[in-house]
């Protein structure tokens, strides 16, 4: 049974286009299912976060990351008696707007889009689920519930100041109450994202031999995790020791979130989800001590992983891919795929063209972006380029 402050599918604010309710699935379950079946979700399989895909199949992709986030989010939501289906829907959709090549690709596309309103991956996720997915007869997008859209827009907190154009375009006609916090379910999805990437960046960095377990054992939280494993399992081999320490690290983060949220909810005594939205700060977050420890860990990862020479070289390569594809399609929109050329025929400004080109490039997988760059810019194939 969910708590009174949980989001209730029976009281959901509805969809942009009214639909008949399902006999067997709640409105939030339908949102989750539509996200899973979306083309943009499938493409996450070939989009990476730090390592570009052709550097190795082992490293996490946006898809595996999203699945891990959803698993963590459901665990936390269950412990707090929240709606797990809404939590999972937001968790699965939170990365839909990401470009190829992780944050490097986003930085490059954002630079290209600066004269045209910029690019923001969270706003792009809204654009995808409200406009760019075009499979249904009655509407563009996925026609998700207000609660899921709110969660995508505000899972990192209230949106204030300059609102990204892609989000503003939707919010101007369908108010998502951007100045308030999102539901507890959306907040859980956001913190689950933090838990998942802190955990798997450490794992992937070790796998890539960018740092050692001895170095990790000197970091906060992780020092206790490795010490406990060594005490319980002296002589454990390297791989099992690494796994046991990292799973404990994972558990520490999840337990910290749950325990702090329980205490915060006990103090606030929210009666409805409206009370969650009106709170003076996020309900779901890390404790101050754990947050400070994570800052130390993120600083370590920034220096040893994100600035690693091999990663820096790849970043330069993929930045060039985006920086050369964008002006190419701006100059030659006739080389966009047929369905995109139809959109171009209906526009009347350079800004509208840039946004179509941005939509197209941001939806590319790492592999396809490399192929298109080789074909269109160099007149070769990736195989020929690599020789």
From Swiss-Prot:
User: Region annotation Disordered: residue ranges?
Assistant: 1-26
Set out the biological process GO terms recorded for this chain's protein. dGTP catabolic process
- Domain called HD: residue spans: 62-198
Q: Name one Pfam family in it.
A: HD
Membrane-traversing stretches: none
Q: Which domain of life is it from?
A: Bacteria
Q: Where is the signal peptide?
A: none
Disulfide connectivity for this sequence is none
Alphabetized UniProt keyword annotations: Hydrolase
Has the keyword Hydrolase been applied to this entry?
yes
**InterPro entries per record:** dGTPase, dGTPase-like, dNTPase_2, HD/PDEase_dom, HD_domain, PHydrolase_assoc_dom
GO MF terms held by the record:
dGTPase activity
Feature: compositional bias, Basic and acidic residues: 17-26
> HAMAP family this protein is in?
dGTPase_type2
- Name the family: Belongs to the dGTPase family. Type 2 subfamily.
Indicate what this protein is called per its UniProt record.
Deoxyguanosinetriphosphate triphosphohydrolase-like protein
Per the UniProt record, the source organism is: Roseobacter denitrificans (strain ATCC 33942 / OCh 114) (Erythrobacter sp. (strain OCh 114))
Source species taxonomy: Bacteria, Pseudomonadati, Pseudomonadota, Alphaproteobacteria, Rhodobacterales
């Amino acid at each position: 049974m969910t708590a009174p402050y949980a989001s209730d599918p029976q009281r959901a604010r509805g969809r942009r286009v009214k639909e008949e309710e399902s006999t067997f699935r709640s409105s939030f379950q339908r949102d989750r299912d539509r996200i899973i079946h979306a083309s943009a979700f499938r493409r996450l399989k070939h989009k990476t976060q730090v390592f570009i895909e052709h550097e190795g199949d082992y490293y996490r992709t946006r898809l595996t990351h999203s699945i891990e986030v959803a698993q963590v989010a459901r665990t936390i939501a269950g412990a707090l008696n929240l709606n797990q289906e809404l939590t999972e829907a937001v968790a699965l959709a939170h990365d839909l707007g990401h470009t190829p090549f992780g944050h490097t690709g986003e930085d490059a596309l954002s630079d290209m889009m600066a004269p045209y309103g910029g690019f923001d991956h969270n706003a792009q996720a809204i654009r995808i689920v409200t406009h760019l997915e075009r499979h249904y007869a009655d509407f563009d997008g996925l026609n998700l519930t207000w609660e899921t859209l709110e969660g995508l827009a505000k899972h990192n907190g209230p949106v204030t100041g300059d609102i990204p154009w892609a989000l503003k375009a939707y919010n101007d006609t369908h108010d998502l109450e951007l100045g308030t916090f999102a539901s507890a379910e959306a907040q859980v999805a956001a913190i689950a994202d933090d838990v998942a990437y802190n955990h798997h960046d450490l794992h992937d960095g070790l796998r890539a031999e960018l740092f050692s377990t001895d170095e990790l054992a000197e970091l906060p939280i992780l020092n206790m995790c490795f010490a406990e494993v060594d005490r319980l399992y002296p002589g454990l081999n390297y791989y099992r020791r690494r796994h046991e320490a990292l799973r404990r690290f994972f558990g520490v983060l999840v337990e910290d979130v749950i325990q702090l949220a329980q205490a915060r909810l006990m103090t606030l005594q929210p009666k409805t989800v409206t009370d969650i939205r009106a709170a003076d700060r996020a309900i779901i977050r890390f404790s101050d001590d754990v947050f400070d420890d994570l800052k130390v860990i993120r600083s370590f990862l920034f220096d040893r992983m994100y600035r690693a020479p091999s990663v820096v070289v790849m970043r330069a390569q993929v930045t060039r891919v985006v920086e050369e594809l964008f002006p190419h399609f701006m100059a030659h929109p006739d080389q966009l795929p047929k369905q995109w050329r139809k959109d171009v025929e209906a526009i009347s400004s350079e800004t509208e063209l840039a946004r179509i080109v941005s939509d197209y490039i941001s939806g590319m997988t790492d592999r396809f972006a490399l192929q298109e760059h080789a074909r269109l810019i160099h007149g070769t194939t990736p195989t020929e380029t690599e020789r």
